[in-house]
Protein backbone atom coordinates (compact mmCIF):
# COMPACT_ATOMS: atom_id res chain seq x y z
CA UNK A 1 0.00 0.00 0.00
CA UNK A 2 1.24 3.49 -0.85
CA UNK A 3 -0.41 6.80 -0.02
CA UNK A 4 -1.11 9.10 -2.95
CA UNK A 5 0.54 11.95 -1.04
CA UNK A 6 3.83 10.00 -1.05
CA UNK A 7 3.84 10.50 -4.84
CA UNK A 8 2.31 13.97 -5.00
CA UNK A 9 2.58 16.26 -1.97
CA UNK A 10 -0.20 18.58 -3.09
CA UNK A 11 -2.57 20.54 -0.81
CA UNK A 12 -5.64 19.44 -2.79
CA UNK A 13 -5.01 15.77 -1.95
CA UNK A 14 -6.26 14.12 1.22
CA UNK A 15 -3.81 12.03 3.21
CA UNK A 16 -6.09 9.01 3.42
CA UNK A 17 -6.03 7.73 -0.19
CA UNK A 18 -4.14 4.42 -0.12
CA UNK A 19 -3.22 2.68 -3.36
CA UNK A 20 -2.55 -0.99 -4.11
CA UNK A 21 -0.87 -0.91 -7.54
CA UNK A 22 0.07 1.35 -10.43
CA UNK A 23 -1.74 0.17 -13.57
CA UNK A 24 -1.34 1.29 -17.20
CA UNK A 25 -4.06 -0.92 -18.72
CA UNK A 26 -7.56 0.20 -17.74
CA UNK A 27 -8.81 -3.37 -18.30
CA UNK A 28 -6.57 -4.57 -15.44
CA UNK A 29 -7.58 -1.91 -12.91
CA UNK A 30 -8.92 -3.19 -9.59
CA UNK A 31 -10.43 -1.34 -6.64
CA UNK A 32 -7.80 0.77 -4.89
CA UNK A 33 -5.40 1.06 -7.86
CA UNK A 34 -3.72 4.14 -9.32
CA UNK A 35 -4.52 4.35 -13.04
CA UNK A 36 -1.73 5.85 -15.15
CA UNK A 37 -3.07 7.49 -18.34
CA UNK A 38 -0.20 7.93 -20.80
CA UNK A 39 -0.26 9.21 -24.36
CA UNK A 40 1.29 6.20 -26.12
CA UNK A 41 2.44 5.80 -29.72
CA UNK A 42 -0.85 4.21 -30.73
CA UNK A 43 -3.33 4.80 -27.89
CA UNK A 44 -4.01 7.70 -25.51
CA UNK A 45 -4.66 6.33 -22.03
CA UNK A 46 -6.72 9.42 -21.20
CA UNK A 47 -9.51 7.92 -23.32
CA UNK A 48 -9.86 5.12 -20.75
CA UNK A 49 -10.07 7.11 -17.51
CA UNK A 50 -13.84 6.54 -17.24
CA UNK A 51 -13.30 2.80 -17.69
CA UNK A 52 -10.64 2.79 -14.95
CA UNK A 53 -12.94 4.69 -12.59
CA UNK A 54 -15.73 2.23 -13.32
CA UNK A 55 -13.35 -0.59 -12.28
CA UNK A 56 -12.65 1.11 -8.95
CA UNK A 57 -9.49 3.20 -9.46
CA UNK A 58 -8.88 5.33 -6.35
CA UNK A 59 -6.81 7.93 -8.21
CA UNK A 60 -5.55 8.81 -11.70
CA UNK A 61 -2.35 10.41 -12.94
CA UNK A 62 -2.98 11.81 -16.41
CA UNK A 63 -0.43 12.91 -19.00
CA UNK A 64 -0.92 16.48 -20.25
CA UNK A 65 0.84 18.23 -23.11
CA UNK A 66 0.54 21.59 -21.33
CA UNK A 67 3.34 22.43 -18.90
CA UNK A 68 1.00 24.97 -17.27
CA UNK A 69 -1.24 22.07 -16.13
CA UNK A 70 1.61 20.13 -14.49
CA UNK A 71 0.62 18.88 -11.01
CA UNK A 72 -2.81 20.49 -11.13
CA UNK A 73 -5.64 18.38 -9.73
CA UNK A 74 -9.22 17.93 -10.87
CA UNK A 75 -11.82 15.60 -9.40
CA UNK A 76 -14.19 13.22 -11.14
CA UNK A 77 -16.66 12.58 -8.37
CA UNK A 78 -14.42 11.99 -5.35
CA UNK A 79 -11.51 10.61 -7.39
CA UNK A 80 -8.50 12.90 -7.85
CA UNK A 81 -6.94 13.19 -11.32
CA UNK A 82 -3.40 14.59 -11.13
CA UNK A 83 -2.21 16.18 -14.38
CA UNK A 84 1.44 15.45 -15.20
CA UNK A 85 3.54 17.00 -17.98
CA UNK A 86 5.89 14.54 -19.77
CA UNK A 87 4.53 11.68 -17.68
CA UNK A 88 6.07 8.92 -19.85
CA UNK A 89 9.54 10.41 -19.33
CA UNK A 90 9.14 10.52 -15.54
CA UNK A 91 7.08 7.37 -15.01
CA UNK A 92 10.08 5.23 -14.00
CA UNK A 93 10.83 7.68 -11.16
CA UNK A 94 7.20 7.72 -9.97
CA UNK A 95 7.06 3.92 -10.06
CA UNK A 96 10.40 3.80 -8.21
CA UNK A 97 8.86 5.82 -5.35
CA UNK A 98 5.62 3.81 -5.45
CA UNK A 99 7.43 0.45 -5.16
CA UNK A 100 10.08 1.65 -2.64
CA UNK A 101 13.12 1.68 -4.97
CA UNK A 102 13.45 -2.11 -5.34
CA UNK A 103 16.60 -1.91 -7.50
CA UNK A 104 18.50 -0.36 -4.56
CA UNK A 105 18.03 -3.65 -2.69
CA UNK A 106 19.09 -5.91 -5.56
CA UNK A 107 22.30 -6.51 -7.47
CA UNK A 108 20.87 -5.32 -10.80
CA UNK A 109 22.74 -5.90 -14.08
CA UNK A 110 21.48 -4.35 -17.32
CA UNK A 111 22.44 -5.92 -20.64
CA UNK A 112 22.16 -4.00 -23.91
CA UNK A 113 23.29 -4.50 -27.52
CA UNK A 114 21.80 -5.88 -30.72
CA UNK A 115 22.66 -9.53 -30.10
CA UNK A 116 23.53 -11.57 -27.02
CA UNK A 117 21.24 -9.86 -24.49
CA UNK A 118 19.15 -12.94 -23.74
CA UNK A 119 22.07 -15.36 -23.49
CA UNK A 120 24.03 -13.01 -21.22
CA UNK A 121 21.12 -12.15 -18.93
CA UNK A 122 20.19 -15.84 -18.58
CA UNK A 123 23.83 -16.83 -17.93
CA UNK A 124 24.17 -14.10 -15.30
CA UNK A 125 21.12 -15.38 -13.42
CA UNK A 126 22.20 -18.99 -13.81
CA UNK A 127 25.76 -18.29 -12.61
CA UNK A 128 24.50 -16.17 -9.69
CA UNK A 129 22.42 -19.14 -8.54
CA UNK A 130 25.48 -21.40 -8.75
CA UNK A 131 27.26 -18.88 -6.51
CA UNK A 132 24.51 -19.10 -3.89
CA UNK A 133 22.20 -16.23 -4.84
CA UNK A 134 18.45 -16.19 -5.45
CA UNK A 135 18.35 -14.77 -8.95
CA UNK A 136 15.67 -13.35 -11.21
CA UNK A 137 15.71 -12.36 -14.87
CA UNK A 138 13.73 -10.03 -17.15
CA UNK A 139 13.87 -10.12 -20.94
CA UNK A 140 12.88 -11.63 -24.27
CA UNK A 141 12.19 -15.15 -22.99
CA UNK A 142 10.23 -13.87 -20.00
CA UNK A 143 10.34 -12.49 -16.47
CA UNK A 144 10.58 -14.17 -13.09
CA UNK A 145 12.72 -15.96 -10.59
CA UNK A 146 15.23 -18.16 -12.40
CA UNK A 147 13.53 -21.41 -13.49
CA UNK A 148 10.10 -19.84 -12.81
CA UNK A 149 10.02 -17.52 -15.82
CA UNK A 150 6.69 -16.27 -17.17
CA UNK A 151 6.47 -15.26 -20.84
CA UNK A 152 6.83 -11.53 -21.55
CA UNK A 153 5.31 -9.36 -24.29
CA UNK A 154 8.38 -7.14 -24.87
CA UNK A 155 12.13 -7.42 -24.28
CA UNK A 156 11.93 -4.46 -21.89
CA UNK A 157 8.55 -3.97 -20.18
CA UNK A 158 6.88 -0.69 -19.28
CA UNK A 159 8.42 1.53 -16.60
CA UNK A 160 5.70 0.41 -14.20
CA UNK A 161 6.02 -3.30 -15.04
CA UNK A 162 9.78 -3.18 -14.46
CA UNK A 163 9.56 -1.55 -11.02
CA UNK A 164 6.61 -3.74 -10.03
CA UNK A 165 8.44 -6.91 -11.13
CA UNK A 166 11.62 -5.94 -9.29
CA UNK A 167 9.55 -5.36 -6.15
CA UNK A 168 7.94 -8.79 -6.58
CA UNK A 169 11.35 -10.44 -7.04
CA UNK A 170 12.71 -8.71 -3.93
CA UNK A 171 9.76 -9.83 -1.79
CA UNK A 172 10.16 -13.39 -3.16
CA UNK A 173 13.71 -13.46 -1.81
CA UNK A 174 15.76 -12.51 -4.88
CA UNK A 175 18.97 -10.57 -4.29
CA UNK A 176 20.28 -10.61 -7.89
CA UNK A 177 18.48 -9.65 -11.13
CA UNK A 178 19.64 -9.40 -14.73
CA UNK A 179 17.54 -7.39 -17.16
CA UNK A 180 17.70 -7.04 -20.93
CA UNK A 181 17.63 -3.34 -21.76
CA UNK A 182 16.37 -2.72 -25.30
CA UNK A 183 17.01 0.41 -27.35
CA UNK A 184 13.24 1.05 -27.28
CA UNK A 185 13.27 0.83 -23.48
CA UNK A 186 16.14 3.32 -23.28
CA UNK A 187 14.72 5.74 -25.86
CA UNK A 188 11.35 5.69 -24.08
CA UNK A 189 12.88 6.20 -20.58
CA UNK A 190 11.46 2.93 -19.23
CA UNK A 191 14.57 2.13 -17.13
CA UNK A 192 15.32 5.73 -16.16
CA UNK A 193 15.17 5.42 -12.36
CA UNK A 194 16.82 2.01 -11.98
CA UNK A 195 20.02 1.65 -9.97
CA UNK A 196 22.37 -0.61 -11.96
CA UNK A 197 25.27 -2.31 -10.19
CA UNK A 198 26.60 -3.00 -13.69
CA UNK A 199 25.72 -2.65 -17.36
CA UNK A 200 27.05 -4.80 -20.21
CA UNK A 201 27.33 -3.75 -23.87
CA UNK A 202 27.46 -6.65 -26.35
CA UNK A 203 27.54 -5.19 -29.88
CA UNK A 204 25.69 -2.90 -32.24
CA UNK A 205 24.55 -4.01 -35.70
CA UNK A 206 21.58 -3.21 -37.91
CA UNK A 207 18.22 -3.69 -36.18
CA UNK A 208 15.10 -1.67 -35.32
CA UNK A 209 15.84 0.99 -37.95
CA UNK A 210 12.10 1.13 -38.61
CA UNK A 211 11.91 2.76 -35.16
CA UNK A 212 15.24 4.60 -34.73
CA UNK A 213 15.61 5.71 -38.41
CA UNK A 214 19.44 5.70 -38.29
CA UNK A 215 22.31 3.72 -36.76
CA UNK A 216 23.41 6.95 -35.02
CA UNK A 217 20.06 7.22 -33.20
CA UNK A 218 20.17 3.50 -32.39
CA UNK A 219 23.69 3.80 -30.90
CA UNK A 220 22.74 6.94 -28.96
CA UNK A 221 19.80 5.12 -27.35
CA UNK A 222 22.06 2.25 -26.22
CA UNK A 223 24.75 4.63 -24.94
CA UNK A 224 22.36 6.26 -22.47
CA UNK A 225 22.71 3.22 -20.19
CA UNK A 226 26.42 4.03 -19.75
CA UNK A 227 26.38 7.83 -19.74
CA UNK A 228 23.03 9.10 -18.44
CA UNK A 229 21.66 6.47 -16.03
CA UNK A 230 22.75 5.38 -12.53
CA UNK A 231 25.25 2.69 -13.58
CA UNK A 232 28.21 1.83 -11.34
CA UNK A 233 30.24 -0.69 -13.39
CA UNK A 234 30.45 -0.60 -17.20
CA UNK A 235 31.54 -3.73 -19.08
CA UNK A 236 32.06 -3.25 -22.81
CA UNK A 237 32.86 -5.54 -25.74
CA UNK A 238 36.03 -4.00 -27.16
CA UNK A 239 35.80 -6.09 -30.35
CA UNK A 240 32.73 -4.15 -31.47
CA UNK A 241 33.46 -0.95 -33.38
CA UNK A 242 31.00 1.11 -31.33
CA UNK A 243 32.16 -0.52 -28.10
CA UNK A 244 35.78 0.30 -28.88
CA UNK A 245 34.81 3.92 -29.53
CA UNK A 246 32.89 4.12 -26.24
CA UNK A 247 35.92 2.78 -24.35
CA UNK A 248 37.90 5.82 -25.49
CA UNK A 249 35.19 8.02 -23.95
CA UNK A 250 34.61 6.02 -20.74
CA UNK A 251 37.89 5.69 -18.80
CA UNK A 252 36.22 3.80 -15.95
CA UNK A 253 34.74 1.10 -18.24
CA UNK A 254 36.08 -2.48 -18.38
CA UNK A 255 37.28 -3.76 -21.78
CA UNK A 256 36.57 -7.36 -22.87
CA UNK A 257 38.12 -8.84 -26.02
CA UNK A 258 38.47 -12.16 -27.83
CA UNK A 259 41.56 -10.79 -29.58
CA UNK A 260 44.90 -11.95 -28.13
CA UNK A 261 46.52 -8.85 -29.66
CA UNK A 262 44.15 -6.44 -27.90
CA UNK A 263 46.25 -3.58 -26.53
CA UNK A 264 45.57 -3.12 -22.85
CA UNK A 265 45.27 0.54 -21.83
CA UNK A 266 44.30 2.20 -18.57
CA UNK A 267 41.06 0.21 -18.34
CA UNK A 268 40.53 -2.95 -16.34
CA UNK A 269 40.45 -5.71 -18.94
CA UNK A 270 39.82 -9.31 -19.93
CA UNK A 271 41.03 -10.95 -23.15
CA UNK A 272 41.11 -14.42 -24.66
CA UNK A 273 44.61 -15.60 -25.57
CA UNK A 274 43.64 -18.91 -27.16
CA UNK A 275 40.30 -20.57 -27.96
CA UNK A 276 39.92 -24.27 -28.68
CA UNK A 277 36.49 -25.11 -30.14
CA UNK A 278 35.09 -28.62 -29.83
CA UNK A 279 31.74 -30.36 -30.15
CA UNK A 280 30.79 -29.70 -26.53
CA UNK A 281 31.76 -26.03 -26.47
CA UNK A 282 35.11 -24.28 -26.13
CA UNK A 283 38.17 -24.05 -23.88
CA UNK A 284 39.13 -20.40 -23.46
CA UNK A 285 42.60 -19.46 -22.24
CA UNK A 286 42.45 -15.90 -20.93
CA UNK A 287 44.40 -13.13 -19.23
CA UNK A 288 42.78 -10.37 -17.17
CA UNK A 289 43.11 -7.72 -14.49
CA UNK A 290 41.94 -10.40 -12.03
CA UNK A 291 44.36 -13.16 -13.08
CA UNK A 292 44.78 -15.76 -15.82
CA UNK A 293 43.29 -19.19 -16.44
CA UNK A 294 41.26 -21.51 -18.66
CA UNK A 295 37.47 -21.22 -18.84
CA UNK A 296 35.64 -24.35 -20.00
CA UNK A 297 32.55 -23.17 -21.87
CA UNK A 298 29.59 -25.51 -22.48
CA UNK A 299 28.25 -23.16 -25.20
CA UNK A 300 28.94 -23.44 -28.92
CA UNK A 301 30.02 -20.62 -31.21
CA UNK A 302 32.60 -17.83 -31.13
CA UNK A 303 30.02 -15.23 -30.12
CA UNK A 304 29.21 -17.30 -27.03
CA UNK A 305 32.87 -17.07 -26.05
CA UNK A 306 32.41 -13.30 -26.09
CA UNK A 307 29.13 -13.59 -24.17
CA UNK A 308 30.68 -15.78 -21.48
CA UNK A 309 33.73 -13.55 -21.08
CA UNK A 310 31.45 -10.51 -20.63
CA UNK A 311 29.49 -12.36 -17.94
CA UNK A 312 32.58 -13.63 -16.10
CA UNK A 313 34.18 -10.18 -16.22
CA UNK A 314 31.07 -8.63 -14.66
CA UNK A 315 31.08 -11.17 -11.83
CA UNK A 316 34.82 -10.64 -11.28
CA UNK A 317 34.18 -6.90 -11.02
CA UNK A 318 31.70 -7.67 -8.20
CA UNK A 319 34.52 -9.35 -6.27
CA UNK A 320 33.83 -13.05 -6.85
CA UNK A 321 37.08 -15.07 -6.71
CA UNK A 322 38.33 -16.26 -10.10
CA UNK A 323 38.74 -19.85 -8.89
CA UNK A 324 35.07 -19.97 -7.79
CA UNK A 325 33.91 -18.77 -11.19
CA UNK A 326 36.07 -21.26 -13.11
CA UNK A 327 34.82 -24.11 -10.90
CA UNK A 328 31.12 -23.23 -11.31
CA UNK A 329 31.33 -22.43 -15.06
CA UNK A 330 31.35 -26.16 -15.86
CA UNK A 331 27.78 -26.42 -14.54
CA UNK A 332 26.35 -23.71 -16.82
CA UNK A 333 23.73 -24.80 -19.37
CA UNK A 334 22.82 -23.40 -22.78
CA UNK A 335 19.85 -21.07 -23.25
CA UNK A 336 16.57 -22.12 -24.91
CA UNK A 337 16.50 -21.17 -28.59
CA UNK A 338 20.04 -19.78 -28.55
CA UNK A 339 22.27 -22.10 -30.63
CA UNK A 340 20.19 -24.95 -29.19
CA UNK A 341 21.45 -28.25 -30.59
CA UNK A 342 19.04 -31.14 -31.31
CA UNK A 343 20.68 -34.46 -32.17
CA UNK A 344 19.53 -37.97 -32.98
CA UNK A 345 21.73 -40.96 -33.98
CA UNK A 346 22.41 -41.21 -37.73
CA UNK A 347 20.49 -37.99 -38.43
CA UNK A 348 21.62 -34.48 -39.36
CA UNK A 349 22.26 -32.12 -36.46
CA UNK A 350 19.64 -29.39 -36.04
CA UNK A 351 20.47 -26.06 -34.39
CA UNK A 352 17.64 -23.69 -33.42
CA UNK A 353 18.61 -20.05 -32.97
CA UNK A 354 16.84 -16.71 -32.57
CA UNK A 355 19.07 -15.01 -35.19
CA UNK A 356 16.86 -12.50 -36.99
CA UNK A 357 19.37 -9.81 -38.03
CA UNK A 358 22.14 -10.02 -40.67
CA UNK A 359 24.88 -9.95 -38.02
CA UNK A 360 23.22 -12.57 -35.81
CA UNK A 361 22.62 -14.85 -38.81
CA UNK A 362 26.26 -14.56 -39.87
CA UNK A 363 27.47 -15.40 -36.36
CA UNK A 364 25.07 -18.33 -36.06
CA UNK A 365 26.16 -19.77 -39.42
CA UNK A 366 29.85 -19.38 -38.57
CA UNK A 367 29.24 -21.10 -35.22
CA UNK A 368 27.26 -23.90 -36.89
CA UNK A 369 30.07 -24.37 -39.43
CA UNK A 370 32.48 -25.19 -36.57
CA UNK A 371 30.35 -28.26 -35.82
CA UNK A 372 29.61 -29.28 -39.42
CA UNK A 373 31.51 -31.96 -41.33
CA UNK A 374 29.07 -32.08 -44.24
CA UNK A 375 26.83 -29.44 -45.80
CA UNK A 376 25.43 -26.51 -43.85
CA UNK A 377 21.72 -25.79 -44.35
CA UNK A 378 20.05 -22.52 -43.45
CA UNK A 379 16.28 -22.13 -42.99
CA UNK A 380 15.14 -18.55 -42.40
CA UNK A 381 12.49 -15.93 -43.10
CA UNK A 382 11.93 -12.33 -42.05
CA UNK A 383 9.23 -10.76 -39.91
CA UNK A 384 6.48 -8.83 -41.66
CA UNK A 385 5.69 -5.16 -40.96
CA UNK A 386 9.32 -4.65 -39.89
CA UNK A 387 12.61 -3.31 -41.32
CA UNK A 388 12.58 -4.35 -45.01
CA UNK A 389 16.16 -3.23 -45.58
CA UNK A 390 17.68 -6.14 -43.69
CA UNK A 391 15.95 -8.82 -45.82
CA UNK A 392 18.32 -8.84 -48.84
CA UNK A 393 21.27 -8.52 -46.44
CA UNK A 394 20.22 -11.72 -44.68
CA UNK A 395 19.98 -13.45 -48.06
CA UNK A 396 23.55 -12.38 -48.86
CA UNK A 397 24.77 -13.76 -45.52
CA UNK A 398 22.97 -17.08 -46.02
CA UNK A 399 24.37 -17.42 -49.56
CA UNK A 400 27.91 -16.68 -48.34
CA UNK A 401 27.97 -19.16 -45.45
CA UNK A 402 25.55 -22.01 -46.27
CA UNK A 403 25.48 -24.68 -48.99
CA UNK A 404 21.70 -25.11 -48.95
CA UNK A 405 19.13 -22.40 -48.18
CA UNK A 406 15.38 -22.53 -47.65
CA UNK A 407 13.42 -19.28 -47.45
CA UNK A 408 10.24 -19.68 -45.40
CA UNK A 409 7.74 -17.89 -43.16
CA UNK A 410 8.85 -16.21 -39.94
CA UNK A 411 6.10 -13.99 -38.46
CA UNK A 412 4.56 -12.43 -41.60
CA UNK A 413 2.02 -10.47 -39.52
CA UNK A 414 -0.15 -8.40 -41.89
CA UNK A 415 2.39 -8.18 -44.73
CA UNK A 416 1.95 -10.51 -47.73
CA UNK A 417 4.42 -13.42 -47.51
CA UNK A 418 5.10 -12.99 -51.25
CA UNK A 419 6.40 -9.43 -50.60
CA UNK A 420 8.70 -10.62 -47.81
CA UNK A 421 10.04 -13.41 -50.04
CA UNK A 422 10.62 -10.99 -52.93
CA UNK A 423 12.63 -8.68 -50.66
CA UNK A 424 14.76 -11.59 -49.44
CA UNK A 425 15.28 -13.13 -52.89
CA UNK A 426 16.54 -9.76 -54.20
CA UNK A 427 19.67 -10.35 -52.11
CA UNK A 428 20.68 -13.65 -53.74
CA UNK A 429 23.19 -13.65 -56.60
CA UNK A 430 22.42 -17.23 -57.59
CA UNK A 431 19.20 -19.13 -56.86
CA UNK A 432 20.70 -22.58 -57.56
CA UNK A 433 21.09 -23.51 -53.90
CA UNK A 434 17.95 -21.66 -52.74
CA UNK A 435 14.51 -23.18 -52.23
CA UNK A 436 11.34 -21.33 -51.25
CA UNK A 437 8.94 -23.29 -49.03
CA UNK A 438 6.53 -20.82 -47.36
CA UNK A 439 5.13 -23.35 -44.88
CA UNK A 440 7.75 -23.40 -42.10
CA UNK A 441 6.96 -26.95 -40.92
CA UNK A 442 7.29 -28.25 -44.49
CA UNK A 443 10.58 -26.37 -44.88
CA UNK A 444 11.97 -28.04 -41.74
CA UNK A 445 10.66 -31.44 -42.86
CA UNK A 446 12.24 -31.07 -46.31
CA UNK A 447 15.63 -30.13 -44.88
CA UNK A 448 15.72 -32.96 -42.32
CA UNK A 449 14.62 -35.57 -44.88
CA UNK A 450 17.07 -34.29 -47.53
CA UNK A 451 20.15 -33.74 -45.35
CA UNK A 452 22.54 -36.53 -44.34
CA UNK A 453 24.15 -37.48 -41.04
CA UNK A 454 27.16 -35.12 -41.17
CA UNK A 455 25.07 -32.13 -42.27
CA UNK A 456 23.98 -29.35 -39.92
CA UNK A 457 20.64 -27.54 -40.32
CA UNK A 458 20.38 -24.08 -38.79
CA UNK A 459 16.75 -23.04 -38.24
CA UNK A 460 17.01 -19.29 -37.67
CA UNK A 461 14.69 -16.53 -36.55
CA UNK A 462 12.32 -17.82 -33.89
CA UNK A 463 14.48 -19.45 -31.22
CA UNK A 464 12.48 -19.79 -28.00
CA UNK A 465 9.20 -18.59 -29.55
CA UNK A 466 6.39 -21.13 -29.69
CA UNK A 467 4.07 -19.20 -31.99
CA UNK A 468 3.73 -17.64 -35.42
CA UNK A 469 1.95 -14.34 -36.08
CA UNK A 470 0.02 -14.68 -39.34
CA UNK A 471 -2.26 -11.73 -40.08
CA UNK A 472 -3.52 -10.69 -36.66
CA UNK A 473 -3.73 -14.31 -35.48
CA UNK A 474 -1.20 -15.95 -33.15
CA UNK A 475 -0.91 -19.70 -33.82
CA UNK A 476 1.13 -22.30 -31.94
CA UNK A 477 4.42 -23.12 -33.63
CA UNK A 478 7.72 -24.40 -32.24
CA UNK A 479 10.83 -25.00 -34.36
CA UNK A 480 12.07 -27.45 -31.71
CA UNK A 481 8.85 -29.49 -31.68
CA UNK A 482 8.70 -29.70 -35.48
CA UNK A 483 12.39 -30.67 -35.74
CA UNK A 484 12.02 -33.37 -33.08
CA UNK A 485 8.97 -34.82 -34.88
CA UNK A 486 10.91 -35.27 -38.13
CA UNK A 487 14.17 -36.41 -36.52
CA UNK A 488 12.50 -39.29 -34.65
UniProtKB/Swiss-Prot annotation:
Carboxylation is probably crucial for Mg(2+) binding and, consequently, for the gamma-phosphate positioning of ATP. Pathway: Cell wall biogenesis; peptidoglycan biosynthesis. Keywords: ATP-binding, Cell cycle, Cell division, Cell shape, Cell wall biogenesis/degradation, Cytoplasm, Ligase, Magnesium, Nucleotide-binding, Peptidoglycan synthesis. One of its GO terms (molecular function) is ATP binding. The modification N6-carboxylysine is found at residue 222. A motif (Meso-diaminopimelate recognition motif) lies at residues 410-413. Its EC number is 6.3.2.13. Signal peptide: none annotated. ATP binds at residues 113-119. One of its GO terms (biological process) is regulation of cell shape. SUPFAM superfamilies: MurD-like peptide ligases, catalytic domain, MurD-like peptide ligases, peptide-binding domain, MurE/MurF N-terminal domain. Its cofactor is Mg(2+). It is an enzyme of class 6 (ligase). NCBIfam families: murE (TIGR01085), PRK00139.1-1 (NF001123), PRK00139.1-2 (NF001124), PRK00139.1-4 (NF001126). Catalyzes the addition of meso-diaminopimelic acid to the nucleotide precursor UDP-N-acetylmuramoyl-L-alanyl-D-glutamate (UMAG) in the biosynthesis of bacterial cell-wall peptidoglycan. This is UDP-N-acetylmuramoyl-L-alanyl-D-glutamate--2,6-diaminopimelate ligase. It comes from Haemophilus influenzae (strain PittGG). The lineage of its organism: Bacteria, Pseudomonadati, Pseudomonadota, Gammaproteobacteria, Pasteurellales.
Amino acid sequence: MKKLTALFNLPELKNDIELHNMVLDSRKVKAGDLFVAIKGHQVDGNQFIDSALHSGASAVVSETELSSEHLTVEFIGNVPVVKYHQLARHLSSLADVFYDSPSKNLTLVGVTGTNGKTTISQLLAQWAELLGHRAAVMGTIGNGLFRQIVEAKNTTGSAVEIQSSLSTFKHAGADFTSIEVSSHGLAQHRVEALHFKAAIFTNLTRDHLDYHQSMENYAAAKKRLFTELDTQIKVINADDEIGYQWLTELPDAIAVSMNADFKVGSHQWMKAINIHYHFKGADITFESSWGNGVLHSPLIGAFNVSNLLLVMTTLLSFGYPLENLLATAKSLKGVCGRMEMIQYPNKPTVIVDYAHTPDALEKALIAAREHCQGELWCIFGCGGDRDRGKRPLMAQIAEQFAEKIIVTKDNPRTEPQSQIEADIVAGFKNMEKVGIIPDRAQAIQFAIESAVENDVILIAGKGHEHYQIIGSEVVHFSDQEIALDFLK
